[in-house]
């Protein structure tokens, strides 16, 4: 991979009125990706037997000394050039108190699914074996039935054309991102609040899924999607010892143009429409609540400082598939930590998922089966740290 970028950003402060700033930026991105593939192998030895009754005639053909080459050699190269603008406006009426709006264009580079070569090699081997059978003298010398048998083979096991570039390449993902929000400092600088609302239009969205063979994960492009939502966060220094924080996010992400058309063996089209379905792996709600209480010990104490920390992290609902038929409902885990500080050393006692919540951390489907990874159960531990 070869990549490079040119970037410029200008900010105009106190434009028209005190505290108003406008920012404009532009990034020129260039990326060249290339791939060489070489899967040379010794020709496969195989044989075939063909037995069929055609009216009163019994056809018996056999050849057990056949060879089929199975090799894949070539290279691919793709260039991407992108212009990514950025615009922002902010009004700050007091230090650390402002409102803002931004518009940016997002980009995620494309690439190659090298895991697809397992599927492509199998297809190439199948085509090679079928061609070897058709060219076999055993069939070719049968002037009466040879052409009929080859026609039947083409109908029953049609050759599949291989396009390496189309099969392995996934396109870049593009998005337009819009956000408005505010950063506030209140309560004599002891309370910080951040609020934001966002909207995102995404084209050629990249999704991860398993290859048809089940050997390795690949990236696909899933048409268009739309996401919008809001986020809010609070941090408070209640006292010198006690601090609290909380954050919440809501995201509504759905496909707006994602239709897949596949063909059965009889060429009947199968149309799957994902429009309106939720984008997988995007939590609809996220929540975090935490706090810290720090005690400074007296000089006669063994410890210099004792810190108690606790937080509750939650997320859901999370859909695992484009069909939205498997999901994890809203769940949360409680975690805590106690730090005992002695000079440059620290002993920490901690617990994760203290309430032993049962939840799914990941899910995927391959070979028409679903596999779920459960979240870690309740854990306890001790950490020892020393700074030198």
Predicted regions and their residues:
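Transmembrane beta-barrel architecture of outer-membrane proteins
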Residues: 1-6, 26-36, 79-85, 103-107, ...
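Signature of Gram-negative outer-membrane beta-barrel scaffolds
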Residues: 1-96, 112, 132-134, 158, ...
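Residues on the lipid-exposed face of transmembrane beta-strands in outer-membrane beta-barrel proteins
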Residues: 6-12, 87-91, 170, 180-184, ...
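Outer-membrane beta-barrel strand-turn architecture
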Residues: 12-18, 83, 91-95, 174, ...
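Gram-negative outer-membrane beta-barrel transporters
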Residues: 16, 190-203, 218-321, 385-387
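Flexible, surface-exposed loop regions and adjacent strand-edge segments
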Residues: 38-48, 53-55, 116-124, 209-218, ...
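Membrane-embedded beta-barrel scaffold of Gram-negative outer-membrane proteins
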Residues: 98-102, 121-221, 226-228, 249
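C-terminal beta-signal and adjacent terminal beta-strands/loops
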Residues: 107, 241, 312-321, 336-388
């Amino acid at each position: 991979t070869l990549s490079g970028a040119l970037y410029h950003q200008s900010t105009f402060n106190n434009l028209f009125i005190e505290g108003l700033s406008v920012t404009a930026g532009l990034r020129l991105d260039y990326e060249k990706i290339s791939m060489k593939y070489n899967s040379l192998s010794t020709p496969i030895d195989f044989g075939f037997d063909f037995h069929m009754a055609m009216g009163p005639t019994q056809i018996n053909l056999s050849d057990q000394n056949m060879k089929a080459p199975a090799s894949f050699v070539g290279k691919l190269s793709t260039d991407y050039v992108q212009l990514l603008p950025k615009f922002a406006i902010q009004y700050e009426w007091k230090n650390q108190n402002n409102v803002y709006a931004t518009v940016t264009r997002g980009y995620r580079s494309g690439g190659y699914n090298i895991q697809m070569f397992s599927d492509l090699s199998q297809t190439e081997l199948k085509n090679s074996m079928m061609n070897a059978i058709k060219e076999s003298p055993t069939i070719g010398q049968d002037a009466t039935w040879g052409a009929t048998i080859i026609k039947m083979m083409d109908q029953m096991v049609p050759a599949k054309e291989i396009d390496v570039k189309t099969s392995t390449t996934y396109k870049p993902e593009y998005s337009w991102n819009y956000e408005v929000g505010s950063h506030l400092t209140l309560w004599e600088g002891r309370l910080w609040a951040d609020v934001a609302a966002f909207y995102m239009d995404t084209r050629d969205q990249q999704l991860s899924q398993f290859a048809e063979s089940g050997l390795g994960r690949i990236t696909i492009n899933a048409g268009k999607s739309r996401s919008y939502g809001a986020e809010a966060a609070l941090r408070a220094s209640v006292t010198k010892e006690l601090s609290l924080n909380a954050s919440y996010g809501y995201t509504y992400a759905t496909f707006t143009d994602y239709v897949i058309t596949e063909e059965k063996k009889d060429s009947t089209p199968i149309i799957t429409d994902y429009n309106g379905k939720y984008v997988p792996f995007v939590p609809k709600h996220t929540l975090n609540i935490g706090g810290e209480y720090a005690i400074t010990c007296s000089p006669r104490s063994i410890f210099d400082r004792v810190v108690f920390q606790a937080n509750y992290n939650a997320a859901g609902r999370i859909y695992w598939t484009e069909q939205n038929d498997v999901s994890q409902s809203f769940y949360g885990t409680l975690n805590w930590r106690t730090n005992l500080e002695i000079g440059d050393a620290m002993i920490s006692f901690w617990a994760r998922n203290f309430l032993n919540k049962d939840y799914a951390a990941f899910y995927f489907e391959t070979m028409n089966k679903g596999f779920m990874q459960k979240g870690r159960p309740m854990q306890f531990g001790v950490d020892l740290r020393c700074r030198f």
